[in-house]
């Protein structure tokens, strides 16, 4: 568990290094599926004050804190529910990075405009529906996960191929095989959101934004890096 704590700590520090967060915003978690335990950033603690020992450890099924003296992130129920729903997830990141959050606040899917997007995501990044007053007034953080899960299931999307979502009026969640990969995907998401924003400014005369990348080009760039026949890199 100490190695997972260190991994999740370093991933949280990467949020600061990559300028994805301000103040105490954002959080990263990681999971040990063999033990059914999750490590996550504590709630409201400044990144500069964090050390690996400060990160609480929770039971995946019950949400009970099994190790640590700090309260876990207020977004913990969202993380836990996503881990339960999507067994391929090994780490989750939540930020309020500016451009990705702008699309979330506008209630807009992030359209795949080019190959930078396609290198990392196999399609548009979905934005969830608005949450109902009952969902907001109930178990809000768990219901946040529910609208994410609903979005992927209703649209028949693979969380392994599209490792990100925009929560309407809120912000982005990203994930990956581990905590570090979930942060990498958060950084990529923010970059392609900025590219998309600027692309739409340049094509402002086109209704609903610019021209989406050709599907064939999107699939070529995604699957040359991912999947059984990937040939990008040294592995």
Predicted features by range, described:
Residues 1-235:
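Glycine-rich flexible loops
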């Amino acid at each position: 568990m100490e190695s997972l704590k260190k991994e999740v700590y370093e991933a949280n520090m990467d949020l600061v290094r990559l300028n994805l967060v301000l103040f105490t915003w954002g959080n990263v978690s990681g999971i040990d599926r063999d033990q059914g335990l999750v490590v996550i950033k504590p709630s409201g603690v400044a990144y500069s004050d964090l050390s690996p020992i400060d990160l609480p450890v929770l039971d995946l099924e019950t949400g009970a804190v099994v190790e640590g003296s700090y309260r876990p992130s207020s977004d913990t129920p969202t993380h836990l529910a996503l881990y339960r729903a999507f067994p391929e997830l090994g780490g989750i990141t939540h930020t309020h990075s500016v451009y990705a959050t702008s699309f979330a606040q506008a209630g807009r899917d992030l359209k795949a405009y080019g190959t930078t997007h396609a290198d990392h995501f196999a399609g548009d990044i979905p934005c969830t529906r608005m949450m109902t007053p009952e969902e907001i007034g109930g178990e809000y953080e768990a219901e946040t996960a529910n609208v994410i899960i609903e979005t992927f299931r209703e649209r028949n999307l693979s969380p392994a191929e599209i490792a990100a979502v925009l929560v309407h009026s809120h912000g982005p969640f990203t994930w990956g095989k581990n905590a570090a990969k979930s942060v990498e995907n958060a950084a990529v998401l923010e970059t392609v959101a900025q590219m998309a924003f600027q692309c739409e400014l340049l094509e402002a005369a086109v209704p609903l934004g610019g021209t989406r990348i050709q599907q064939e080009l999107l699939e070529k760039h995604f699957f040359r890096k991912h999947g059984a026949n990937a040939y990008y890199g040294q592995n």
